[in-house]
Amino acid sequence: MMIMRKXHPLLKIVNDSFVDLPTPSNISSWWNFGSLLGICLVTQIITGLFLAMHYTSDTATAFSSVTHICRDVNYGWLIRYMHANGASMFFICLFIHVGRGIYYGSYMLSETWNIGIVLFLTTMATAFVGYVLPWGQMSFWGATVITNLLSAIPYIGTTLVEWIWGGFSVDKATLTRFFAFHFILPFIITALVLVHLLFLHETGSNNPSGLNSNSDKIPFHPYYTIKDLLGVLLLLMVLMILVLFXPDVLGDPDNYTPANPLNTPAHIKPEWYFLFAYAILRSIPNKLGGVLALILSILILALFPLLNTSKQHGLTYRPITQFLYWIFIANLLILTWIGGQPVEYPFTTIGQMASILYFSIIIIFMPIASMIENDILKLHF
């Protein structure tokens, strides 16, 4: 008799994706982050569902409903902080996952890579609308500032902003629709994840050597299920340490003040995971130019497969591009720091220089470095 997991129509899909999947034998722990993102997504959906049971998306009661969750609901504080800090863990895993893709040349699997970019943008949109829901000062002003950027679009900008707001300012209609978006988007993300995996399993995984690994594959279970389980335990440990010991360390104190349209906070800034993009936005004095730079800071990822001039897959044996890669990572950290600083000298100048470097490394320096490496190694085929 055939094993059920291999013959059953539904179990067969699960089996081919998580059990009998042929996997390169040498993939390192940097490949764990895909499964960790899956765990983050499931955690966020579950905690989010329980929060939605007690939350009210009305300007008069939103802030107090979050307070009620933390004070009166059984383990409400735990669910709320797991959800808030879970978002931070989600983005940490996301950044590492994308960083690994850039380092090891995974962008050459272009369908998987492009769906990944769509996933990244959708996750950013979800996190943004979610941050508005507690209806604190930073929620309100963050929503006002970021949605207002759309007014930079010529001709239709102002109409578009008012259409998104559902009125002439961020108000009850805005909060209600943002809650609706925040509820539906994770399920859209889940569907996109399945497409992401579908495309990945068409080609198979990349590996640290950058060489074809078809001759040396091992089953996903038990080898990588155990390896992923270690990652999951470490992730949950870090998350719970964050939640139980320093739950507010990544948040903004201003968000403990109820939203007040008549009082602007001294420094309006988004959550830490958006600061790099916010710094790029602020580094351009022109409104439309800033918005375009903001969008391009993410969409530039789509250029990686097109700008690849190297004859080798990944940066494992390419020291010059490796050096540029780590400068790029350091530059990203500088942008994150600048995004959280006030708009004054010297921060503006540092931000402008870091923004120029961000785009220059990807568009100019990396392709040139790859060509130099080809030349040194005489890879002219």
UniProtKB/Swiss-Prot annotation:
SUPFAM superfamilies: a domain/subunit of cytochrome bc1 complex (Ubiquinol-cytochrome c reductase), Transmembrane di-heme cytochromes. Heme b b562 binds at residues 83, 182. InterPro entries: Cyt_b/b6_C, Cyt_b/b6_C_sf, Cyt_b/b6_N, Cytb/b6-like_sf, Cytochrome_b, Cytochrome_b_C_euk/bac, Cytochrome_b_N_euk/bac, Di-haem_cyt_TM. GO terms for molecular function: metal ion binding; ubiquinol-cytochrome-c reductase activity. A ubiquinone binds at residue 201. The chain crosses the membrane at residues 33-53, 77-98, 113-133, 178-198, 226-246, 288-308, 320-340, 347-367. It is a multi-pass membrane protein. Keywords: Electron transport, Heme, Iron, Membrane, Metal-binding, Mitochondrion, Mitochondrion inner membrane, Respiratory chain, Transmembrane, Transmembrane helix, Transport, Ubiquinone. One of its GO terms (cellular component) is respiratory chain complex III. One of its GO terms (biological process) is mitochondrial electron transport, ubiquinol to cytochrome c. Heme b b566 binds at residues 97, 196. Binds 2 heme b groups non-covalently. Its cofactor is heme b. Gene3D superfamilies: Cytochrome Bc1 Complex, Chain C. PROSITE patterns: CYTB_CTER (PS51003), CYTB_NTER (PS51002). It is found in: Mitochondrion inner membrane. Pfam families: Cytochrom_B_C, Cytochrome_B. The keyword Transport applies. Component of the ubiquinol-cytochrome c reductase complex (complex III or cytochrome b-c1 complex) that is part of the mitochondrial respiratory chain. The b-c1 complex mediates electron transfer from ubiquinol to cytochrome c. Contributes to the generation of a proton gradient across the mitochondrial membrane that is then used for ATP synthesis. The cytochrome bc1 complex contains 11 subunits: 3 respiratory subunits (MT-CYB, CYC1 and UQCRFS1), 2 core proteins (UQCRC1 and UQCRC2) and 6 low-molecular weight proteins (UQCRH/QCR6, UQCRB/QCR7, UQCRQ/QCR8, UQCR10/QCR9, UQCR11/QCR10 and a cleavage product of UQCRFS1). This cytochrome bc1 complex then forms a dimer. Heme 1 (or BL or b562) is low-potential and absorbs at about 562 nm, and heme 2 (or BH or b566) is high-potential and absorbs at about 566 nm. Belongs to the cytochrome b family. This is Cytochrome b. The lineage of its organism: Eukaryota, Metazoa, Chordata, Craniata, Vertebrata.
